[in-house]
Structure formats: structure tokens, C-alpha cells
């Protein structure tokens, strides 16, 4: 602590009080609520588990943002706080002083601790303070379930002792604790892992889901009803895990089962979700026209802002299906990613009218597709009226590749100059990115082989 930033008297008092932990615990009954945060921070810093356990039982605020103090999971601290909750849960009537209803383990609440530590320069919102430290009337009825908030990013074999301990603790007290997870990411090869997480977490609290999985993916269709119970989901990402250990045969088996999961989820989501979906990301998967029909007909996409279908092969889809989907979300869509979708000139030409109606579109990317210079120029002309468009990513035009699929840098530079001139002639400030990709070589070879067969 420097001379320019001396410790506050209240912080010094908290440190002094903790020299005698028994005295500190005894004094909690008489401690003003304003002194609780500084004392808890001191107890956390000095790892005074008994004091933290006792403070949880008399916490005078509605929320304890523990995650804002723990930069990394600390099992001893977590155990102390959960032991304090156990004492609370064992009581039939809420203690007079305790107002605690929410334990927040997310990386939030820094403003709360900054305010009570006197670090006013890092307090960003007084309204946030009110919501974190809001007082609540004491109930004389049996305690309602306590809520515990956590953002989960679970990778197989990397759960760690803290998350394992937390899950076991919550599962044993499921009737008294609601584990609420607004953001969830699971990377797993195991159905049992996913099943266990879904069994413990309160599903209707989830707002963002990022599910990465592999092996025998057709069996994941069994989880579609669980996904359907996530009634407040706003952002959904379903992605495969590609590893070097997989053969192409395994990947085909994986992809063949995936549409069943998508179809089931879209069907369930249409009936079960309480609020609209704001973001959908379905990548590197094989979808059917039935899946796309379910998606375009779902009433839950009426306010969709983000759509990512990168890696989903759209080559043989009926253009009207994709066109209908874009038309339905044209008034709200802000970000559209169609990278590596096997899009060629005929399909993109059919989609241009629908794309030009996406008035809120800010980000548009179709990299890794085989598009000619003429169609790319037509697309730029038709989207010139989209005033919100800020980021545009396009593939190098097909003409910049040789007959062997080798990129001709000189030809690419010439085509870029023509595109820049087109943008200048259109008269609106606009910046686009032209990207090269190796995947395009495979698309080009298929295109050349097809032309060769036709001739």
C-alpha cells in the first residue's frame, strides 16, 4: 500500500478484528451492514474460513457476489461459504439479520466490492449497486430455495475439484438450491456428462447454450426434450468436435445423426420457448431441408439478430427455403455468417433480393464459397442500400484461380481494383475484406470436374 493510496480505517479495523477470529464471529450480531463487505473481503484475503462461514449466515444483503472476489476457483473458500448455506438451509425460519437469497459465483459484482472498499473510481453504476445490495423483507415462512448463479464452461476431464464439489453439493440439496446458469458451454464426448449437467442445472434459467460434442451423435437426439425445456434460451450454438483421431467414416456417421437432433430441437423450441431466439449458430453439420423448414417456420425467430450456418452445406437446397428464412428475419437480422456453405453463383443470385431487404444487417460473411466476379459485383450493388452494414467478408472471386485451383496473386490484385472502383462509383463509404481460403480449392476442383463431364 503506497503513501498515495493508504488503507482506509475501516479496512484496518477489519484486519485488526480478524486477529481474533472468535471475537470477529461473536461481533457479527452487532456489526452494522456497512461493515460486512470490508470484513468479508478481509476474511477472504486472509483465508479465514470460519469467519466467512459465519458471515454467510448473517449476510445483510440479498446477494453475495462471491465470484467477483475469486479470480480463480478456491475450494477452501467455496466450502466455507457452502457450509454457511447449509446452516441456513437447516433453519425453518430465516434469521432476523440475514437477507441472503442469491449466491453469485459468476465473474460479476466487482462494483459491489469496489464501492464498499472505497474504490469509487472503479464503480460504474449506482443502479447496479442498488440491485446487488438491495434489502429484502424478512420472511417468517419456511425458506424458499436459495438461488446460486454460475457461468459454466465444462470441458471433459478438466472440471477441477471446485466444480465437482459444487455439483455434488447442489445435487444433494436439489430441493433447497436452484443452480441457475445463464451461460453454459459444454465440450464433451460423453452423453452421461451432458445428462448430469442438465439434471443439476435449472434449465429454464439458461439464456445461452454452447454445446460441443462428438461420437455417436445420433443418440444426442434424446436430449432434444431437455433443450426444449430451456424456455428462455436466447442464443444457441450446436457444434461438432473435430479431432485428428476421427476418420472420415466416423464423421459421416456423426453428421448423419445430427439432423435428427436439430429437427427435434427446432420442433420442441417452437412449442416450449417463452421468449424469441436472438442468436442461432449451427455450424459444420449436415442439415436437411426439413430442418430449414422447421427453422424458417418457427415463431421464435421473429426477433433473430444473429444467424451462423458456417460449414453447413447449402449447395443442393431449394433456394426458396433459404430465401424464405432470410425474408422472415429481414427486419431484425444484424449478423449473417454463411462461410464454407458450398454457395455458388445460382444460389447466391437467388438470395440477393432477400439479402437486400435485411435493413439492420451490420455483419455479413460468405468466405470460402465459389463466387464469380460478376455475381460478387451484383451482390455489392444490391446491398449498397444497407446503411447499417459495417463489416463485409467475401471470398476471392473464382476468376482469381487458375484451372488447377492455384491462386493468381496478380489477377486477384486486378479484380480487387475493379471492386474498389465499383464501390467508389456507388458513392457510399464502404469497406470490404476479400479472403483467400484453401477450402476454395476443393470447391473449384469439383466445379471444374463438373464442367468437364458436361462437355
What is the predicted function of each stretch?
Residues 1-215, 221:
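N-terminal adaptor-interaction module of cullin-RING ubiquitin ligase components
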Residues 19-56, 321-324, 334-342, 346-368:
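Extended amphipathic alpha-helical scaffold segments
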Residues 62-81, 230, 235-240, 245-248, ...:
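Long amphipathic alpha-helical scaffold regions
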Residues 196-201, 221-230, 247-276, 292-301, ...:
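A structural signal for leucine-rich repeat
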Residues 19-23, 33, 48, 110-113, ...:
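Short, solvent-exposed loop/turn at the beta-strand->alpha-helix junction
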Residues 2, 75, 84-87, 117-123, ...:
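C-terminal capping region of solenoid repeat domains
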Residues 7, 11, 33-41, 50, ...:
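Amphipathic alpha-helical interface elements that mediate macromolecular binding in regulatory proteins
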Residues 64-67, 98, 103-106, 148, ...:
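Conserved hydrophobic beta-strand positions in leucine-rich repeat
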Amino acid at each position: 500500500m503506497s503513501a498515495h493510496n493508504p488503507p482506509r480505517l475501516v479496512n484496518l479495523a477489519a484486519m485488526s478484528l480478524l486477529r481474533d477470529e472468535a471475537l470477529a464471529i461473536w461481533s457479527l450480531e452487532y456489526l452494522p451492514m456497512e461493515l460486512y463487505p470490508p470484513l468479508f473481503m478481509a476474511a477472504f484475503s486472509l483465508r479465514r474460513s470460519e469467519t466467512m462461514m459465519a458471515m454467510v449466515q448473517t449476510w445483510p444483503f440479498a446477494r453475495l457476489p462471491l465470484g467477483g472476489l475469486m479470480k480463480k476457483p478456491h475450494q477452501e473458500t467455496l466450502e466455507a461459504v457452502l457450509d454457511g448455506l447449509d446452516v441456513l438451509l437447516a433453519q425453518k425460519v430465516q434469521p432476523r439479520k440475514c437477507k441472503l437469497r442469491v449466491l453469485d459465483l459468476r465473474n460479476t459484482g466487482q462494483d459491489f466490492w469496489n464501492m464498499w472498499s472505497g474504490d469509487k473510481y472503479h464503480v460504474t453504476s449506482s443502479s447496479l449497486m442498488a440491485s446487488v445490495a438491495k434489502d429484502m423483507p424478512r420472511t417468517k415462512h419456511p425458506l424458499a430455495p436459495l438461488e446460486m448463479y454460475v457461468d459454466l464452461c465444462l470441458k471433459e476431464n478438466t472440471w477441477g475439484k471446485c466444480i465437482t464439489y459444487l455439483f455434488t453439493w447442489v445435487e444433494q440439496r436439489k430441493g433447497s438450491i436452484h443452480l441457475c446458469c445463464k451461460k453454459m458451454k459444454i465440450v464433451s464426448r460423453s452423453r452421461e456428462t451432458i445428462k448430469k449437467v442438465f439434471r443439476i442445472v435449472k434449465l429454464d434459467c439458461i439464456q445461452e447454450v454452447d454445446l460441443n460434442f462428438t461420437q455417436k451423435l445420433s443418440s444426442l437426439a434424446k436430449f432434444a426434450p431437455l433443450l426444449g425445456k430451456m424456455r428462455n434460451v436466447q442464443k444457441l450454438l450446436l457444434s461438432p468436435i473435430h479431432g485428428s483421431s476421427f476418420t472420415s467414416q466416423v464423421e459421416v456417421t456423426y453428421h448423419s445423426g445430427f439432423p435428427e437432433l436439430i429437427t427435434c430441437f427446432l420442433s420442441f423450441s417452437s412449442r416450449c420457448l417463452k421468449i424469441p431466439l436472438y442468436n442461432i449458430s449451427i455450424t459444420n453439420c449436415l442439415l436437411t431441408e426439413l430442418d430449414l423448414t422447421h427453422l424458417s417456420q418457427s415463431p421464435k425467430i421473429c426477433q433473430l439478430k444473429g444467424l451462423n450456418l458456417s460449414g453447413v452445406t447449402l449447395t443442393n437446397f431449394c433456394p426458396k427455403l433459404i430465401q424464405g428464412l432470410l425474408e422472415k428475419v429481414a427486419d431484425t437480422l444484424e449478423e449473417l455468417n454463411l462461410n464454407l456453405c458450398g454457395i455458388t453463383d445460382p444460389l447466391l443470385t437467388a438470395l440477393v433480393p432477400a439479402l437486400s431487404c435485411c435493413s439492420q444487417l451490420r455483419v455479413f460473411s460468405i468466405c470460402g464459397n465459389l463466387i464469380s466476379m460478376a455475381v460478387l459485383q451484383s451482390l455489392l450493388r444490391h446491398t449498397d442500400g444497407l446503411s447499417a452494414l459495417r463489416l463485409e467478408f467475401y471470398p476471392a472471386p473464382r476468376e482469381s484461380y487458375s484451372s488447377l485451383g492455384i491462386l493468381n496473386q496478380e489477377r486477384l490484385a486486378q479484380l480487387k481494383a475493379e471492386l474498389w472502383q465499383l464501390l467508389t462509383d456507388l458513392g457510399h463509404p464502404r469497406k470490404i475484406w476479400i479472403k483467400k481460403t484453401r477450402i476454395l480449392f476443393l470447391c473449384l476442383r469439383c466445379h471444374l470436374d463438373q464442367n468437364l463431364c458436361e462437355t
